[in-house]
Amino acid sequence: MDYNRMNSFLEYPLCNRGSSAYSAHSAPTSFPPSSAQAVDSYASEGRYGGGLSSPAFQQNSGYPAQQPPSTLGVPFPSSAPSGYAPAACSPSYGPSQYYPLGQSEGDGGYFHPSSYGAQLGGLSDGYGAGGAGPGPYPPQHPPYGNEQTASFAPAYADLLSEDKETPCPSEPNTPTARTFDWMKVKRNPPKTAKVSEPGLGSPSGLRTNFTTRQLTELEKEFHFNKYLSRARRVEIAATLELNETQVKIWFQNRRMKQKKREREGGRVPPAPPGCPKEAAGDASDQSTCTSPEASPSSVTS
C-alpha cells in the first residue's frame, strides 16, 4: 500500500468537544511549531493553528504522527494505540473535510479516517470525524459556517434588499390641465331669434316686425322730413312704442329704398303729356294715351 500518496491530503476534523474533555485551564489557541521537517511542500497557515499541517506528515510509515495531548496542555484519554495519534484541532473550525492537494480523484489518494473509527470513538464525547466508531456524535455543521456567515452577512443583506420587489408606487394623481390665455378661444354665443310682441323691438339686432299703424306714422313722417333730428327721433320712438335705434334704422332703410326707386325711374322714358304717371312704366308701344294734338288718322292707324 502506497502511504506516500496519502500524505498529500489534509484533514481538519471538527472539534466539538464537551466540557468534560478539557481540564480546568483552557487549551492554547496556537500550537508550538515543530522542529521536524514536513514531508509535503505546502507551508502551514497560521489560521489553522500554526504548524498544524506540517508535523502531521513527518513520517513515511503511512499514518501521521502528531504531538501527544500531554504536550498541548489538554488531557485526553490515551485510548488510542501508540501507532495512532488522535487528531488535534482548534475549537473554532468545522467538521472534517478532505482537501485534495494536487492529485486527481481517480488516484484514490483521499485521506479517509475510517481506519481511526474505533480509536476516535473511545475519546471523551467523540470527535466529529467521518469514522464509524461507537458513541454519540454531535451534528455536523458546514465548515467555517459561523465565521463566513458573519463576514458575508452585511454584503448579502444589501443584495437581498435589492432583490426584493419594491411595491410599485401609486401612480401620481393626474394634475388638472392648466388652461393658458392663449388656449382660450373667444366665441360669441349664437343668437337665437325670439318672437317679440308686435311693436316691441329688441336691441339684439334681430329683424323687427312693425305693425300697420307704426308703418303709417313712419311713412307720414318720412314724407315731410327725410332726415330726423335726435329730439324728433326720440319723440317718434316714444309715440310708436319703439326705441331710438329702431326708428333710426327704419329711416336709413327708407332713404336707400327711395334712392333705388329714383335710379330705376330714370331709365324709363318719360310719359307723353296727357298720360297718367302710372302709365309711365308701361311699354313704349302702348298707344292708349295720345296727345291732344294727335290727328284722328294717326290714332286709328
From Swiss-Prot:
Species this protein is from: Pan troglodytes (Chimpanzee)
This protein's GO CC annotations: nucleoplasm; nucleus
CDD domains: homeodomain
Name under which the protein is recorded: Homeobox protein Hox-B1
Positions of the DNA-binding region: 203-262
Compartments in which it is found: Nucleus
Lineage, top ranks: Eukaryota, Metazoa, Chordata, Craniata, Vertebrata
Biased composition (Polar residues): 19-38, 55-70, 284-301
Region (Disordered): 19-77, 127-149, 255-301
Record function comment: Sequence-specific transcription factor which is part of a developmental regulatory system that provides cells with specific positional identities on the anterior-posterior axis. Acts on the anterior body structures.
